[in-house]
Regions:
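Acidic/histidine-enriched segments that form metal/cofactor-coordinating
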Residues: 39, 66, 73-186, 232-233, ...
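M16/MPP (pitrilysin/insulinase) zinc-metallopeptidase core fold and M16-derived inactive scaffolds
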Residues: 34-99, 166-167, 279-294, 307
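N- or domain-start disorder-to-order transition segments that initiate the globular core
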Residues: 2-31
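An aromatic/glycine/proline-enriched structural segment found at the starts
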Residues: 2, 160, 164, 168, ...
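Short amphipathic alpha-helices in soluble, non-transmembrane regions
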Residues: 110-115, 210-217, 326-332
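A structural supersecondary motif
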Residues: 254-258, 278-317
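Extended amphipathic alpha-helical segments enriched in small hydrophobics
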Residues: 312-333
Length: 333
């Protein structure tokens, strides 16, 4: 059944028999089409001891299928028709996306259906992708100055027991200890049609997009049993102050405020945008580029259960670090 269309975007919605939700946005001005597959699973759904599983599957989903698609062939096939593909993991979702010429839409949908229904979760693929993720963590976090700043912020803002209290990149000890049975169970629990939203946007008519979605993704068998109930954690309100001393040439400062969840009607950019702008203006007005100060304006993370508003600088001198609290307080008023 088609849902209502918005005035800004021609959004046509349907739910397939297996529970998958589909959204089609026709845009005849585009020569290509984008396919986005959203799974409602992220690092917030990981159990203790399994930190990093959601992000691990971002990589495993490109490792081939039991139906004959070889490892890395998904990406190579998309690129062979002039398209691109990638994926991302966050706290509440994992997203896989392709952009292809309009004539390759069926190819992209077939590939998505194949890896949803027939993903090759094997010991060999697990071993390979585990090392890929560990190397990514070393390069982007462990061996980068201030690389774990956001991790410290999460722990300080939410606490280690909150679903948002650990980073999506995962834990190396947990990844090293991961066995095939645990990884397979995570996949079968969350990667199912009724936990997915397929979005098709670009050079495609609404009826054609919905028909093709049903042809390929609708053929994936429905899952049995209910999805797990997601646990909502409590946000910390004790406003901890964390100081880490390291042999780095300059000081990094970040402040974070708890904000309402994304479903809260108060959590709108229209309502809070002016305040965020004032905070950024305060930082920029007092920056000293010639002295190595590098202010970072407001950034926000709106999530299912809670959000954060972060502001700070990744490279400031001691006098600027001391004044950051006063200036951000002034911007909040």
């Amino acid at each position: 059944m088609l849902g209502p269309m918005s005035e800004a975007l021609q959004l046509h919605r349907a739910t397939l028999d297996n529970g998958m939700r589909v959204v089609v946005n026709p845009d005849t001005t585009s020569p290509g089409v984008a396919v986005n597959m959203w799974y409602r699973v992220g690092s917030a759904d990981e159990e203790p001891g399994h930190f990093g599983f959601a992000h691990l599957f971002e990589h495993l989903m490109f490792s081939g299928t039991t139906s004959g698609i070889a490892s890395s062939e998904h990406l190579a096939t998309i690129e062979s028709v002039g398209g691109s593909a990638n994926a991302s993991t966050s706290f509440d979702r994992t997203n896989y996306f392709e952009t292809v010429p309009a004539g390759a839409l069926e190819l992209a949908l077939w590939l998505e259906a194949e890896r949803l229904a027939h993903l090759a979760v094997t010991e060999a693929n697990l071993a390979t992708q585990r090392e890929v993720v560990k190397e990514e963590k070393r390069q982007r976090y462990d061996n980068t100055p201030y690389g774990d700043l956001f991790d410290l912020l999460l722990d300080g803002r939410f606490g280690g027991e909150h679903p948002y209290g650990h980073p999506t990149i995962g834990s190396v000890p947990d990844l090293d200890a991961a066995c095939l049975d645990d990884v397979t169970a995570f996949h079968s629990t969350w990667y199912r049609p009724d936990n997915a939203v397929l979005v098709i946007s670009g050079c495609v008519e609404a009826d054609e997009g919905l028909t093709l979605a049903d042809k390929y993704l609708g053929a994936v068998p429905a899952a049995t049993g209910d999805l797990p109930e997601r646990i909502q954690g409590r946000v910390r309100h004790d406003n901890p102050r964390v100081v880490v001393t390291r042999p780095l040439p300059r000081t990094a400062v970040t402040r974070a405020w708890a904000t309402p969840p994304i479903t809260n009607p108060d959590n709108t950019h229209r309502r809070h945008g002016h305040r965020h702008t004032r905070i950024g203006d305060e930082l920029t007005a007092h920056s000293h580029p010639g002295k190595g100060t590098s202010p970072r304006r407001w950034s926000g993370y709106e999530r299912l259960w809670a959000g954060t508003g972060n502001v700070g600088s990744s490279s400031v001198g001691t006098p600027q670090a001391r004044g950051l609290r006063e200036r951000t307080d002034r911007g909040c008023r």
